[in-house]
């Protein structure tokens, strides 16, 4: 299906637009609400069997109805590919250093990767999550609430200590509320996590940098390279942003008060590579989500995914996947 056809499909266009996590100057509250959309979409896909996550139920509203647009198979397949790709990169990084490595997730939302890693006996030195304080305070309440089939606190190496209602410290796990655009605040909050700047550290950002100005995101990347001895970065965000598909996405997000301030960096693989190399990363690999789906991820799993909800045609899925990418960079 071509860009014009996708643009006229308001259901799919709105679904793609509203499921994203990000940081926006224009309306932070609207941006933070997209975390709820993403969590419900993931929960729906997991219930359908796209992947296993025993922990998402602690954060999702099981009684809420997922909007019709976000029940499209293409949406669930996209979330699966995104989740699987990020996890594969992180697991590979941790295994490379036999667990003597740290993970820092920017714009974490209600992500559950920490618990999925620990439950599978993956070794890691420390896992830090960062988001707006309004998001982390909610996540803390979900983590600490009694009842439920899974006790998230059992994954912590020490008793959870909460400060300012928005920060949680528990040995191997830290959750802090900070605005990534505010350098001094971010550095102060990260300091409370006692990260080791001399051991390998992988940073994650899923549709986060695109909502910051290009100068702000570039400054963030440069600071990481200067402050950490062995940093790596896995970045998931929009791609090929000069067509009608992106204009429709921008329009839908704009109606929700969300602006894509860093969209210029998402135009091409060359732009992405230039951004990371200018920040000091030596190795930069960019793959769109079609490449991720058809080459990077386990093809037996891809075959299984295709069988869950059979698609009449693949053009729409391919079009959606072509407009998102994963960047993996390291020094």
Curated annotation (Swiss-Prot):
Keywords: Methyltransferase, S-adenosyl-L-methionine, Transferase. It holds the Pfam family LCM. It comes from the Eukaryota. GO terms for biological process: methylation; regulation of mitotic cell cycle spindle assembly checkpoint. One of its GO terms (molecular function) is protein C-terminal leucine carboxyl O-methyltransferase activity. It catalyses: [phosphatase 2A protein]-C-terminal L-leucine + S-adenosyl-L-methionine = [phosphatase 2A protein]-C-terminal L-leucine methyl ester + S-adenosyl-L-homocysteine. Its EC number is 2.1.1.233. InterPro entries: LCMT1, Ppm1/Ppm2/Tcmp, SAM-dependent_MTases_sf. GO terms for cellular component: cytosol. S-adenosyl-L-methionine binds at residues 82, 107, 131, 179-180, 206. Methylates the carboxyl group of the C-terminal leucine residue of protein phosphatase 2A catalytic subunits to form alpha-leucine ester residues. This is Probable leucine carboxyl methyltransferase 1. The gene is lcmt-1.
């Amino acid at each position: 299906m071509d860009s014009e056809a996708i643009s006229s499909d308001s259901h799919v266009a709105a679904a793609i637009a509203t499921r994203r996590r990000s940081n926006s100057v224009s309306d932070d509250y609207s941006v933070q609400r997209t975390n709820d959309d993403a969590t419900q979409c993931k929960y729906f896909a997991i219930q359908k069997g796209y992947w296993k996550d025993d922990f998402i139920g602690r954060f999702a509203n099981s009684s809420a109805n997922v909007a019709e647009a976000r029940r499209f198979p293409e949406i669930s397949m996209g979330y699966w590919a995104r989740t699987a790709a990020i996890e594969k990169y992180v697991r590979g990084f941790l295994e490379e250093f036999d667990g003597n490595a740290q993970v820092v997730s920017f714009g974490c939302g209600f992500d559950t990767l920490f618990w999925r890693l620990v439950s599978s006996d993956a070794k890691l030195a420390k896992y830090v999550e960062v988001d707006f304080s309004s998001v982390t305070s909610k996540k803390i309440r979900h983590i600490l609430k009694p009842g439920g089939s899974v006790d998230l606190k059992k994954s912590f190496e020490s008793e959870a200590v909460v400060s300012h209602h928005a920060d949680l410290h528990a040995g191997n796990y830290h959750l802090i509320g900070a605005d990534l655009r505010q350098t001094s605040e971010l550095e102060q909050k990260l300091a409370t996590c006692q990260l080791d700047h001399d051991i390998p550290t992988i940073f994650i950002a899923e549709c986060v940098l695109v909502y910051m100005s290009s100068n702000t995101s570039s400054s963030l990347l440069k600071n990481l390279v200067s402050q950490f001895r062995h940093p790596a970065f896995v970045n998931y965000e929009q791609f090929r942003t000069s067509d009608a598909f992106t204009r429709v996405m921008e329009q839908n997000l704009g109606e929700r008060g969300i602006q894509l301030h860093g969209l210029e960096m998402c135009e091409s693989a060359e732009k992405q590579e230039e951004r990371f190399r200018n920040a000091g990363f030596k190795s930069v690999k960019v793959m769109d989500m079609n490449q991720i789906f058809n080459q990077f991820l386990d093809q037996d799993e891809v075959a299984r995914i295709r069988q869950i909800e059979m698609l009449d045609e693949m053009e729409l899925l391919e079009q959606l996947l072509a407009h998102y990418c994963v960047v993996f960079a390291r020094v």
